[in-house]
Amino acid sequence: MYQTTAELRSAFLEFFRSNGHQVVDSSSLVPGNDPTLLFTNAGMNQFKDVFLGMDKRNYTRATTAQRCVRAGGKHNDLDNVGYTARHHTFFEMLGNFSFGDYFKEEAIRFGWTFLTETLKLPKERLCVTIYQTDDEAFEIWNKKIGVAAENIIRIGDNKGAAYASDNFWQMGDTGPCGPCSEIFYDHGDHIWGGRPGSPEEDGDRFIEIWNIVFMQYNRQASGEMLPLPKPSVDTGMGIERIAAIMQGVHSNYEIDIFRTLIAKAAEIIGVSDLTEKSLRVIADHIRSCAFLIADGVMPSNEGRGYVLRRIIRRAVRHGNKLGATEAFFYKLVPSLIAVMGDAAKGLAETQAIVEKALKAEEEQFARTLERGLGILDTALNELKGTTLDGETVFKLYDTYGFPMDLTADVCRERNIIVDEAGFEVAMAEQRSRAQAAGNFGADYNAALKIDAETAFSGYTELAGQAKITAIYQNGESVTAIKAGDEAVVVLDVTPFYAESGGQVGDKGQLVASGVEFTVNDTQKYGQATGHQGVLATGNLSVGQVVEAKVDKKLRHRTQLNHSVTHLLHAALRQVLGTHVSQKGSLVDPERLRFDFSHFEGVKAAELKEVEELVNTQIRRNHELKTAEMGIDEAKEKGAMALFGEKYDSQVRVVTMGDFSIELCGGTHVGRTGDIGLFKITSEAGIAAGVRRIEAVTGAAAMAYVAQQQAELEEAAALLKGDANSVVAKLKAQLDKMKQLEKEMAQLKDKLAAAASADLVGDAVVVNGVNVLIKKLDGVEASSLRGLQDELKQKLKSAIIVLGTAQEGKVNLIAGVSNDLIGKVKAGELVAMVAAQVGGKGGGRPDMAQAGGSQPENLDAALAQVLPWITERLA
């Protein structure tokens, strides 16, 4: 009998393979053919174009075990995960599909046969639903399969609109859809609930296990239902639900996969109660997070990356609730790979990247989690009523990185609701402030609306005749301008490249007899190209013909930098992993800036490897080839596209040997060898999960190398050596410095011992305890600890507080002998003093240090110490 999840997956695929179906691998969780979907959320997603007749396959029957995520967008189960028996962010959808091959009867028969013969489920435990008008499905179930009429339930439009029914399936607001028939399993009368369609249908007794969709229509945005070219079948059965039945449990969280993950999470965190709901959340979330990262999604503040971040942070919060004190979430990945078996093939290949990304995100959130939870706890304790205000929810989001649903999750546990409307208002106000700041000093011409088109000739020429079709000054259309006027000039055709895709706009001149217009920038205005600049001499008017001349040197240098970003992108993906994707770029004549997704700083060795890889491709002198083709053809060829960019149906593809292929409308060199040299000048993080590389090429790269060489030679001269001996000389100097620092520390200890002898006499006795409170002048902060140790030895049973003020900063130390820490703790003592000098600190009960930023308050703060100690020694 098939019992484990892995056995069920294999049995399902084998059943349909033996019935003429092609076994197709699960597609990525990032839909490749549907921009309307955030994540793959059903088995049919990868076949959408097949159902629409737009994609031809060499098979008409298929079966899959599809990985799915439902978190964000229309299908969003995140809020319920952990609180119900069957909600998940990640699940596997077993499915069989017919593309114009078999239809209702065969689809129904396949489902019934697999359940009752292969899995041997008792027929009396099964009932089915159909759409209210689907008489054909009723006849098949009743007459041909033999299901009693009373076990066939008709479901009408129960969601307030036509075709809005549990038994009329649609993937989204538009697209393939049709009536469906669902198979339900009766878990028994010991569980509350009624049959589908009854008042008690929301109970957990009758559970839907298989949905058989009869794809007959393509729903338009207008709501019109157009017949599909060929009626088809799409079915889906959640593997978690059927596994629960086969393993004799009621909750999905009791099946083998979740038992393993829950036990491992409990072991890592140190929890003994395996029924904790937080363990369910963690076990569910590791599946969605790990597989999303394996499919190229990285935590970020937008789109898919933000949904991933929300899920990770929700899991981390639940771990914190269970008592986790260090990063734990990433440690579940090996167990996940083991328990998922064949379904984790892609995950196993990217295991190291997945673990690093999860750990980095977890550690980043841990820095603000405790403080954020503290603020939330205070707000909830002080709350009057049952609603947390939107301002507080926004503050937690904006300052501490708490997604709203994480705050709502905490509130839910205390029967508090969040003011979502208030949160959205606060968000809108922040966007308005950001927009206002961004518009400060804005160019009047930036918002021009130009109803014209400019043809671009700059791929093949840098100069050519053109006719002026419009002129704008200060946002207003004019017919002519005179010498000295600043304006935007629009031409009917231009070799000037308008800023786009990170490449800056061209500079140059528009010239005619006695006329020279200096172009300082080129921008797109809809379909028109605007040449921004100033008229140096003569007069210009609409209708005039000019010679448009691009600055060749600037264009050439820009092209070097643009072409190398393609090589850099490919090299980063090769060295760091295929999760790397471009997040932004700036390409100008002087340098290039490339932003990309990555979860940690790029190591020096990795940067060196990337740089060498790019320079190798430059030396290979690949010819750059460009081609216009359909977007689907480009993607089939493996062309990289920027996430979030909108592309036309026809795109331009730039290829550099077999190393790089990208969609790009920019201008490029003829061969990679033209770039000459590539040199990385810096690498840094600019946002969570986003890194930035700055680099130079060609002559600028040579100048950079020459500058580094000059600095190396200058350093060599200072060290009285040559460039070849700099490292050895510097190492010797550092060793000498360390020795001097060691000797200095020893000298300070001796001075501290001498100073302590003088200070002992300043101690006062409080209830038999020596108490020394002293502000020290001219004493280095680094000497305080040694001085405190000396004083403790001399005073024996003692409490000591020392403070110094230097360069606008306060340094404090408190020491308490071991016999007194039951009454006075050094950490509490130093924290009290630090709070009065604008600082904070802490440490052990016997010794603690702190700092502050208000030296003017040090005397008053130290004056509070004796009463504080006296009270505790009383």
Curated annotation (Swiss-Prot):
Cysteine pairs bridged by disulfides in the record: none
Gene Ontology CC: cytosol
Keyword Ligase: yes
Name of the protein in its database record: Alanine--tRNA ligase
Keywords per UniProt: Aminoacyl-tRNA synthetase, ATP-binding, Cytoplasm, Ligase, Metal-binding, Nucleotide-binding, Protein biosynthesis, RNA-binding, tRNA-binding, Zinc
Gene Ontology biological process terms, A to Z: alanyl-tRNA aminoacylation; negative regulation of DNA-templated transcription
Protein localization: Cytoplasm
Predominant place of localization: cytoplasm
First-level EC class: ligase
Molecular function in Gene Ontology: alanine-tRNA ligase activity; aminoacyl-tRNA deacylase activity; ATP binding; tRNA binding; zinc ion binding
Residues that hold Zn(2+) according to the record: 562, 566, 664, 668
Alphabetical list of SUPFAM superfamilies matching this protein: Class II aaRS and biotin synthetases (SSF55681), Putative anticodon-binding domain of alanyl-tRNA synthetase (AlaRS) (SSF101353), ThrRS/AlaRS common domain (SSF55186), Translation proteins (SSF50447)
Cofactor or coenzyme needed: Zn(2+)
